[in-house]
Amino acid sequence: MEKTVIVTGGCGYIGSHIARAFKQNGDRVFVIDRVKREHTLKDVDGYFISDFASEESLATVLNLSPDVIVHCAGTSLVGPSITDPADYYTNNVSKTIKLLDLVKDFEKKPIILFSSSASVYGNGTNKPFNEGDPINPISPYGKTKAMVESILTDYWNAYAIPSTVFRYFNAAGAEPFNFDLGQEPNATHIVARALEASITA
């Protein structure tokens, strides 16, 4: 059955891959992102170049009444989160609450697929990490992801908004069929840098 899917941050590395996967599944896919990258938008049913918490974006969510919201938008680097935590708490937590506060009043609640991070584990002693390990984020970035995970649990208990959390660890690589979606140039992620070094060595 065809679903209506909104991907926030759908022009980004992870969001663009997810948007394409839903489209290949036969779903209607709409992207909301502050940055327009043409090559990531060629197959989607619609896109809106705007902050995901703007009035325009929230009106779009309301009008589309999606079955699924894949929430990838936010600020994502650990280092800058230490020097400018306000930006991270605003973009990753406060704005997500605005989105959830809209959705909680929907008669038909969409499932929220949240793009979290393995950084919620901090410097845990059990490696590799598994989902049952305690979380102990050490950066503001990781803390914002852990906070949203907790908020999603509370919103499920209070408002029956279903959600699933994905804790990624250093996603890297290109889309395997067309090779038109892939890692950003000058990536800061260690896996991407290691791959680049091995290819150019």
Language model features with spans:
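Conserved glycine-rich Rossmann-like NAD(P)H-binding loop of the short-chain dehydrogenase/reductase
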Residues: 27-35
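NAD(P)H-binding glycine-rich loop region in Rossmannoid oxidoreductase-like domains
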Residues: 55-91, 126
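Conserved Rossmann-fold NAD(P)-dependent oxidoreductase catalytic core, especially the SDR/UDP-sugar
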Residues: 71, 97-140, 154-158, 164
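Active-site helix of classical SDR
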Residues: 144
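SDR active-site strand-loop-helix element
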Residues: 8, 32, 69-72, 112-117, ...
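NAD(P)-dependent short-chain dehydrogenase/reductase
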Residues: 153-201
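N-terminal Rossmann NAD(P)H-binding glycine-rich loop of SDR-like oxidoreductase domains
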Residues: 5-24
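Rossmann-fold cofactor-recognition segment
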Residues: 44-54
